[in-house]
């Protein structure tokens, strides 16, 4: 859809708060997009945020007011695609300016089926979320009552295994080809490309699916195991907690973000 064609819409939160704006990106199914509304304070790096699998199931609000000025480039993606439910911005750049840009941000969102809304008071929204915490919300072209009902019915990220939708389907290896190089096994709960790149500077990295068992990991004879970031509720990942618990004490383990929470569950 042309960026010159204005599509009026609104974001309504579960508490009834209304933010009117202009729809951008893809047209949501049934004209309504819903999810857990959160905010991110980065000044640049919006592509990295949008393609971070940790935001699966969430609607990401950017506190910085001007987003999209340098377009979009797949070289800056942190995963194979965006996994967030939606995007909220104050002002979407009408033109991108970068020799690296492959598409306007609006076009990138449309390509991957990610809806968004622009032109709203993100400062007010951020202050509200700061005080209340993440809250379910819905946005689209529907009437306020319909959006409010959808927001109220949105379960958010609790009680859902979001990792299953973002983890790799098959194991793969990157980094050093030296068979004597230090070998790290990285669990992909929603791992970012930049983390894999950093680990690869240390030796050889085998990235494995979230459902990989402890025996399968130990068969790879790793020097250490890395538990990645990822989306959603750690209480829904008993299969990962079981595997991690069986690895504790048998191989060095390091976890960040969701991986840290899962390690905490495994050791009590």
Question: Where in the sequence are the language-model features?
Answer:
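RNA-binding accessory domains that recognize and position tRNA/RNA substrates
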Residues: 1-220, 234
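Cysteine-nucleophile active-site neighborhood
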Residues: 223-224, 229-268
């Amino acid at each position: 859809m042309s960026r010159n064609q204005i599509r009026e819409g609104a974001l309504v939160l579960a508490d009834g708060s209304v933010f009117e704006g202009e729809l951008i990106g893809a047209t949501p199914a049934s004209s309504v997009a819903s999810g857990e509304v959160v905010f991110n304070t980065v000044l640049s790096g919006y592509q990295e945020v949008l393609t971070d699998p940790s935001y699966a199931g969430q609607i990401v609000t950017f506190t910085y007011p001007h987003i999209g000025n340098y377009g979009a480039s797949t070289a800056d993606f942190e995963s194979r695609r965006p996994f967030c439910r939606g995007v909220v911005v104050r002002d979407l750049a009408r033109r991108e300016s970068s020799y690296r840009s492959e598409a306007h941000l609006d076009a990138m969102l449309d390509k991957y089926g990610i809806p968004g809304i622009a032109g709203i008071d993100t400062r007010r929204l951020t202050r509200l979320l700061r005080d209340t915490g993440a809250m379910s919300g819905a946005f689209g072209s529907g009437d306020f009552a319909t959006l409010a009902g959808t927001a109220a019915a949105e379960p958010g990220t609790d009680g859902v295994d979001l990792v299953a939708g973002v983890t790799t389907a098959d194991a793969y290896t990157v980094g050093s080809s030296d068979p004597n190089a230090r070998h790290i096994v990285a669990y992909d709960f929603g791992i970012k490309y930049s983390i894999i790149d950093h680990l690869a500077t240390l030796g050889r990295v085998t990235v494995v699916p979230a459902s990989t068992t402890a025996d399968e990991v130990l068969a790879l004879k790793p020097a250490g195991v890395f538990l990645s970031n990822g989306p959603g509720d750690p209480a829904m990942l008993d299969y990962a907690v079981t595997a991690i618990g069986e690895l504790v004490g048998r191989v060095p383990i390091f976890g960040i973000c969701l991986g840290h929470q899962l390690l905490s569950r495994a050791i009590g």
